[in-house]
Amino acid sequence: MEPIKVISIVGSPRPNSRTAAGDAAVRQALMARGAACRVWNLGRQPLPLLDPDADEDVDCPAARLVVAVRQADAVVLASPIYHNSFSGHLKVALDHLGMDDVGGRAVGLVSHGGARSTQAVDQLRIVVRSLHGVAVNTQLCTDEADFGDGPRLIDPAAVDRAGRLADELLAFAAMLRDHRAAVALTAL
C-alpha cells in the first residue's frame, strides 16, 4: 500500500522557530512510522493575500500549495501563538484553501507559546471543521522549556505527545483516504 502523504504548513515567519521545531518533531515521528512528509514553511515560502477577483495563475505559490494539499492524505497546521490566536501567515494560507482541498483529510495541530496555551489550536479546530477536514484529538502545544539547542524538542512528555499525534493522524488519514476512494468509485 502507498504510504500516507502528509504536508505540514508552518505559519511562523521566524527562521529556526520553535513552531517549526515542534512540527519537525511530529514529521520525524510520522516518517518513522512510514509516512511521506513534506513541509511548506510560510516564513520561507510566503503567500500573497487572497484576491478572489484575480485570475488564477496556476504557477503561483498559492496554487502550488493547493495542489500539494490536494495530493496529501493528511495536513499538519503549525502556528506560533500571536495575540491569543494563530498567525496571520497561517491565516493567509488557509484563505487560499477550500473544502475541496482540505475536506475529508485528517489534520494535526501544533502550536508554540503562551505556556503551552491551546488557544491557537482551539481556533484552528473551528477553521478545519469549516473546511470539512477532521482535526485529530491529540495536539502538540509547546513552550520554551520544551526545547533544547537548535531548537529541538527535548521534553520527554512533548516528544511522546508528538508520537501520539503521529499515530492518530496516520490512523485517521488511512481511514479517510479509503473513504475518499470509495466515494470516488461510487461517483463513477
Where are these regions (language model features)?
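N-terminal beta1-alpha1 ligand-phosphate binding loop
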Residues: 2-35
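A general structural signal for well-ordered alpha-helical segments in protein cores
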Residues: 19, 23, 62, 87-90, ...
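A generic structural motif
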Residues: 33-38, 133-135
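Glycine-rich phosphate/pyrophosphate-binding loop and the adjoining helix
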Residues: 2-4, 64, 134-188
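N-terminal beta-loop-helix "entrance" segment that forms/cooperates
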Residues: 42-59, 150-151
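Glycine/Thr-rich phosphate-binding loops of Rossmann-like dinucleotide-binding domains
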Residues: 17, 85-86, 179
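Helix-loop-strand module that forms the ligand-binding subsite of alpha/beta enzymes
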Residues: 57-132
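Residue-level recognition of beta-strand->loop/alpha-helix junctions
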Residues: 10, 41, 111, 139-141
